[in-house]
Amino acid sequence: MRNINTYDWMKKWMTRSISILVMIHMITRTSISNAYPIFAQQGYENPREATGRIVCANCHLAKKPVNIEVPQSVLPDTVFEAVVQIPCDMQIKQVLANGKKGALNVGAVLILPEGFELAPPDRISPEIKEKIGNLYFQNYRPNQKEILVIGPVPGQKYSEIVFPILSPNPATNKEVHFLKYPIYVGGNRGRGQIYPDGSKSNNTVYNASTTGRVSKILRKEKGGYEITIDNASDGRQVVDIVPPGPELLISEGEFIKVDQPLTNNPNVGGFGQGDAEIVLQDPLRVQGLLLLLASVILAQIFLVLKKKQFEKVQLAEMNF
């Protein structure tokens, strides 16, 4: 009877332990997958450097195109679309953190003029909501509503990201004026090559740390390689570690030089940045323009009528 109780207790303990481990794994996995935009947020106060370079390029080394479309002008206190296009080949697979291949993800940072911000849900029309889908936008900082980040999200579904933006009203915000403003955007597809601490990810090329002969290549149980190089100058052995993901380009017995690539470059993604301009239009100016156009049209009509009247008078005089 005592043995049965002990067995039941052990069974319950193992079940609870497995459940706890699964929960920890899920929480950790979720936090890591959602951490990519936070890399820049944690390391930089402002995502755009004084030179105009967006800091995402420090981790995403390859260059790829990105486009942004915004209206030429908007009225105060109105919601408009800022459409960011991140072209990517849906057939290409990227190297994941575990070394396996997976679909490309995308992300973007949108730097708006002072006063512009993400539109509140109750101001977004059903048409724009349908274009947004299930995307979740966040501020770069709690006090920086004009800088928005998104991602990583599946590139297959969101190669075009629609940001719903609310324009400011100079009548209530004295810091804003009716002017032409710049908008900056950065967009990436795929994982980065360098982490914020300067260490390499497994999504980049690995080079030899010394010159010598490759004496041993050990394939690790969980993937990746340990490459032993006999230094050509002093004979000491140097071990270079290659994580799972990149493919080896060298073999045992081969003589290699320092900085020679040991692997291919598995990166298929890249980062790009662009800009656009938008005019915050004064409604009174628009009304004035409409009145001017109306007056010009009326003047043209009166001129045509006057001309016809004059022609009739001339025709009557000729007949007389």
Swiss-Prot record:
Cofactor(s) demanded: heme
Gene3D superfamilies xref list: 2.40.50.100, Cytochrome f large domain, Single helix bin
GO molecular function: electron transfer activity; heme binding; iron ion binding
Residues making up the signal peptide according to the UniProt record: 1-35
Membrane topology: Single-pass membrane protein
Key word Isomerase present: no
Binding sites annotated in the UniProt record for heme: 36, 56, 59-60
Keywords associated with the record: Chloroplast, Electron transport, Heme, Iron, Membrane, Metal-binding, Photosynthesis, Plastid, Signal, Thylakoid, Transmembrane, Transmembrane helix, Transport
Cofactor: how bound: Binds 1 heme group covalently.
Entry-linked HAMAP family: Cytb6_f_cytF
Family under the similarity heading: Belongs to the cytochrome f family.
Matches recorded under PANTHER family: CYTOCHROME F, PTHR33288
Subunit structure: The 4 large subunits of the cytochrome b6-f complex are cytochrome b6, subunit IV (17 kDa polypeptide, petD), cytochrome f and the Rieske protein, while the 4 small subunits are PetG, PetL, PetM and PetN. The complex functions as a dimer.
Protein name: Cytochrome f
